[in-house]
């Protein structure tokens, strides 16, 4: 029940954990750093998977599966890659009761094992582009874990593509980060900033990393998806060459891109409240709950509730009836608010007699009367669409209200305690590291979206917020998950 949840104002971190566990989304495992994704949480992941998988296939990608064990010699082939991931790796040293001749790494990501196969499959320009996605689990040995946001094992998808030239590879990088943006904004109702990572924040082994960054309700940033231009780095490491149209050998150009179950954590923190989970209808496996008020002729009320549910389900609106008598209607109202069901329909004998029902929205708690007529399904569908749009607009307004443009160091320090700060940066790793050391804020993204850049005059030259040196652009700073 909702009374188990600490308020956001009292303790935001505890609110998040309370909500995840009370809404039965996930729980702690007996395995250190790992979580159990419960049915309510996994249902959200399934909705995310279905939407994303459809978008991947629309852009020409196919699914495959590669081993979770990676030979140590493969990992060592890409020096920058292993340097970035070595501290997080889990290593298998024994199998079948014997010490292994070569250690096996449990995949922290799959570039190396996948490129060992791509080397065999790619011989000619006719074999390109190769556009493959994998749905899998990965392991990164995290020291400080939090359900969905940072766990030792998590679920994700990782796309790995090979191309004949750098231009096509870059087009793929941008195409896929825009797929993630579309998913975040149209399905998650979560506004994101699209852009490029700084050199210190980019993926280990990449030439460039692009990302989408979202603001959570505590003002912190969450990296919700990444798309990497790997150049020819992995192709050279695995000697993956192809014969060009001109008949000469060249190394292929590569990309990789991925999102994970951390998106569920982002979804929770972007929209939910002190009463529990708030879900955008497009990602709710159960969009409508009908709660019959069982007075008078109970079976007649039940029959009407089931008839409405059948009509809504036939219309593509996922609906169920809770006509159990173990708990009161009030208890059910609170329970389904906790679980984030977008719409609740209350239906009693008087409502049936008057040819109407009461419809309650989870996002605003607004109640309206809806007629029990032929247009009811369209009316409920319109309410669901309004909820989806309202959640996006509310989150966008929150981000705008908690974004500041800083021109002094004092403004900067105050701003990162509240949300995003847009400020000039001199482009050096040294200044970036100093800002992080002094404020815990990092460069989240160098925006590429023209509308966002224009809104905040990102190309305006100025003075670096920390060093005082000349700066050619502004970037987005924030504390982050």
Swiss-Prot record:
Pfam families: HGTP_anticodon, ProRS-C_1, tRNA-synt_2b. It is found in: Cytoplasm. InterPro entries: aa-tRNA-synt_IIb, aa-tRNA-synth_II, aa-tRNA-synth_II/BPL/LPL, Anticodon-bd, Anticodon-bd_dom_sf, Pro-tRNA-ligase_IIa, Pro-tRNA-ligase_IIa_arc-type, Pro-tRNA_ligase_II_C. GO terms for biological process: prolyl-tRNA aminoacylation. Keywords: Aminoacyl-tRNA synthetase, ATP-binding, Cytoplasm, Ligase, Nucleotide-binding, Protein biosynthesis. The keyword ATP-binding applies. GO terms for cellular component: aminoacyl-tRNA synthetase multienzyme complex; cytoplasm. SMART domains: ProRS-C_1. Its main location: cytoplasm. Its EC number is 6.1.1.15. It catalyses: tRNA(Pro) + L-proline + ATP = L-prolyl-tRNA(Pro) + AMP + diphosphate. PROSITE patterns: AA_TRNA_LIGASE_II (PS50862). CDD domains: ProRS_anticodon_zinc, ProRS_core_arch_euk. Belongs to the class-II aminoacyl-tRNA synthetase family. ProS type 3 subfamily. Consists of three domains: the N-terminal catalytic domain, the anticodon-binding domain and the C-terminal extension. Homodimer. This is Proline--tRNA ligase.
């Amino acid at each position: 029940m909702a009374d188990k949840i600490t308020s956001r104002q009292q303790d935001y971190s505890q609110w998040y954990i309370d909500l995840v566990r009370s809404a039965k989304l996930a729980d702690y495992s007996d395995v250190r750093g790992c979580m159990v994704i419960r049915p309510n949480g996994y249902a959200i992941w399934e909705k995310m998977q279905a939407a994303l998988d459809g978008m991947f296939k629309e852009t020409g990608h196919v699914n495959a599966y590669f081993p979770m064990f990676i030979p140590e010699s493969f990992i060592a082939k890409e020096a920058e890659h292993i340097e970035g991931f070595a501290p997080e790796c889990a290593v298998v040293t024994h199998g079948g009761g014997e010490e292994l001749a070569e250690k096996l790494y449990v995949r922290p990501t799959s570039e190396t094992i996948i490129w060992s196969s791509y080397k065999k499959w790619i011989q000619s320009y006719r074999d390109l582009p190769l556009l493959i996605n994998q749905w899998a689990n990965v392991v990164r040995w995290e020291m400080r874990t939090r359900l969905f946001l940072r766990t030792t094992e998590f679920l994700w998808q990782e796309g790995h593509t090979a191309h004949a030239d750098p231009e096509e590879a870059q087009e793929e990088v941008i195409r896929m980060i825009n797929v993630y943006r579309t998913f975040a904004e149209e399905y998650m109702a979560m506004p994101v900033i699209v852009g490029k990572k700084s050199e210190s924040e980019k993926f280990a082994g990449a030439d460039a990393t692009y990302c989408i960054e979202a603001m959570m309700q505590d003002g912190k940033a969450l990296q919700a998806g990444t798309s990497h231009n790997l150049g020819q780095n992995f192709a050279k490491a695995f000697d993956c060459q192809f014969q060009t149209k001109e008949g000469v050998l060249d190394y292929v150009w590569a990309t990789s891109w991925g999102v994970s179950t951390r998106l569920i954590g982002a979804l929770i923190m972007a929209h939910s409240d002190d009463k529990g989970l708030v879900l955008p209808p497009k990602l709710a496996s159960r969009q409508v709950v009908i709660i019959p008020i069982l007075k008078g002729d109970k079976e007649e009320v039940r029959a009407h509730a089931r008839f409405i549910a059948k009509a809504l389900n036939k219309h593509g609106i996922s609906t169920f009836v809770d006509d159990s008598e173990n708990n009161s209607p009030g208890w059910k109202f609170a329970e389904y608010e906790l679980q984030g069901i977008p719409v609740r329909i209350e239906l009693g004998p008087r409502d049936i007699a008057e040819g109407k029902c009461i419809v309650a929205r989870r996002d605003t708690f607004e109640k309206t009367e809806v007629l029990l007529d032929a247009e009811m399904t369209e009316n409920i569908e319109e309410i669901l669409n309004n909820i989806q749009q309202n959640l996006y607009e509310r989150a966008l307004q929150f981000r705008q209200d908690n974004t500041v443009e800083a021109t002094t160091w004092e403004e900067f320090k105050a701003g990162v305690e509240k949300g995003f700060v847009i400020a000039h940066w001199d482009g050096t790793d040294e200044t970036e590291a100093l800002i992080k050391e002094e404020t815990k804020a990092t460069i989240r993204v160098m925006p590429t979206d023209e509308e966002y850049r224009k809104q905040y005059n990102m190309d305006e030259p100025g003075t670096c917020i920390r060093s005082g040196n000349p700066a050619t652009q502004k970037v987005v700073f924030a504390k982050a998950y």
